[in-house]
């Protein structure tokens, strides 16, 4: 295959894969909008695209919205306004009250394809009958026009031949994909995985009975005929005769049939550093090629039983020349046939031409009768007075109403929520008292409850900030041996923090410490793998315990794990000279091992090691000292070449180690910038004696979605380490000095930053890293901890009602039950997570401090008065606000269609490959949130509304910043979020809706 064509196919597949969202490994669940790649489109257009590509619903059922209406979440006046905005009744014999009555009655609808149990008015049926007549030719033309947009060859084969090609392909491809993508769960490894997905498939399919039985000889021959995946894609699509202009969308449809696995492969292929991607490469091109080969092979194997060869032109000819048969088959397969005609249609599929007129007439009569009964129920006796033209208009209005009903409900819900929030903000009390202590919490909605209860107990001032606290870092927890990115997925951290045993840090400087970790190289069998990876584990290679685990280090680790009090952290960055010295020492240690174990040179002198390293690194051409040990001339050159190739002692690997170690820690200037910027962003410039930095995490047993309950701003991990590192930096006198110089923020000597963790499953808060404080400070912290414990009890008691359907007067019983939830391995719902989230407030705490937001609002502290140029607001709008929208959309779509966009019931979940879950023994990867997270007793607990972002800032200032941030501007203009600006100087609200900013009239109502 020529290179140009190959590159074209590859780029075509990558573009076609754009609508598919990433799926991250479950151990670091990352909230995302399932339609994230469609955010460049308006929300209303994107959800239609999602329906066509993924077959997913974007709105709830009417009865669910009616339930919201009855609970007061939706106000009737907002529902009426939404009807007026979305449905034009000009010239129709209807009122908006008629539509309101219709939308409020769950049973008031046309019951299509059901047996008639009542007699419809004959005259009315006759008037309506003509509106329900169908033209089979037009129906089939419209259907074929959607080929490549909504349907594939396999879809048409299943639809018109009564086959199950898609299911068969999915079964084979799911098993193949999960075996290939396995990350250590499977006992037997799939052969030839290292050669990539396509070649591993070709090898396996030769001998595997599943492929032989389903695809027969034809699949084997087809598979052998293609050496490259691009060649397979090109040839198979051409063999179907599909016009090339349809290929891009056609490929999208094929990939979307297993959107979970395809999304995971897409994520892996875009993250080349990911260990399993490096070792077992795969991409969408290979995945698509395998899918098309399986599909084509099965079609070839079954070709003899088909009425014609399934190609683009043959289906077109079938629709044109056998209209009646095609039409009736389509009607029957898609369940468009009225129930009472179903058996007759089945019997007459091969006699379609003579039966078609009878069918069309009877179907029109049945549908007209159904609609007549519906009109009678809706409009009463006045329907009899309507003329034929008026009935036609009513039918048109009803069609428009059906198309827009979900959007009508959504806008009414959002308008109601916005009114409730803005009314509450207007009641804000701006008075402030000198606080006893201050606390920074994550913006997570679950923090709102705790903050409110803590403020209620005592004079505490709380702030909200993204839960990585403005400190993006890769963190190496000692018992894991590999790095975690503790920051939003939008950010790739440049600095690494290392957790180590305290006794090691006390004994060694940084350089000596890291060398000590590698000390046991002398005691281990040397391999090329170990030489490179020996230090790599600090920065992302997960091999500790698998390949290289020195005994003394292992014992230190065991001791460390007994208590987190025995740990310390490398936060300060070593100098470049220190890093250079360390890398040289590592390589000298390796060289020493080589001399001793392979050449019998005991205790080689340091000058020999240094000179040998210089030659290996190309700093000198030859070593006379090596000659003294018998390495002369050609023998020396061969020796050096061996060191470079086998033991990786060369400039390239030296540079890699140097680069990785250079990422360790933060300079003092970096620390001052991070802490100063975070404090200024939330408006914290005057300090109480204690400032608590409270990260959050969750605790639940037997829960593959545990990371979905942790901190999204920390990449699905706990926020504890970010809190600890933040406090270590903020408590450093040298850092404080630089903060004062750079930001003008003076942190008093007697102010202490204390890290803590809020367990959102139990609502307990614990303080950490207390050994660094004097004894008198620890005593004061004990008193404050009592207040935090009281806040924990109040918050747990508040959450009890949502978690359990029972009443309990005993407060201790409530708290016990909530805590017990975390440790019950059979519990499918340890907590509600972020269910119910609907708003994101950016502003001072005084705006919402008086409100009970029920743990459903993100709260990000921000004071526009200290941000004259809007740079801090830019950071919030381009980071935390975007992550908030991702979370909101994950919950939104997991609620509107839990089977397609969510992950179904946890009861049927099985962990596969250590990276994902499937339902039962066979399904695509489940990508969204489980039913138990968003539903309670069959009803949605989450409120699926687009995120309401409320910003406190002067109107013109806010607009200028919004216009500078493309990501948020795009979401606003395409109406993926509802954006409201509260101008505190004019006390006015402004909202973006339907293409423009307008003042939002809000007033405080009595009660």
From Swiss-Prot:
InterPro entries named among the record's database cross-references: DabA
Listed GO MF terms: zinc ion binding
Subcellular location: Cell inner membrane
Superkingdom as given in the UniProt entry: Bacteria
Topology in the lipid bilayer: Peripheral membrane protein
Residue runs in coiled coils: none
Gene Ontology cellular component list: plasma membrane
Signal peptide start-end: none
Residues that coordinate or bind Zn(2+): 442, 444, 696, 711
Keyword check for Membrane: yes
Pfam assignment, any one: DabA
Family: Belongs to the inorganic carbon transporter (TC 9.A.2) DabA family.
Assembly and binders: Forms a complex with DabB.
Job description of the protein: Part of an energy-coupled inorganic carbon pump.
Name of this chain's protein: Probable inorganic carbon transporter subunit DabA
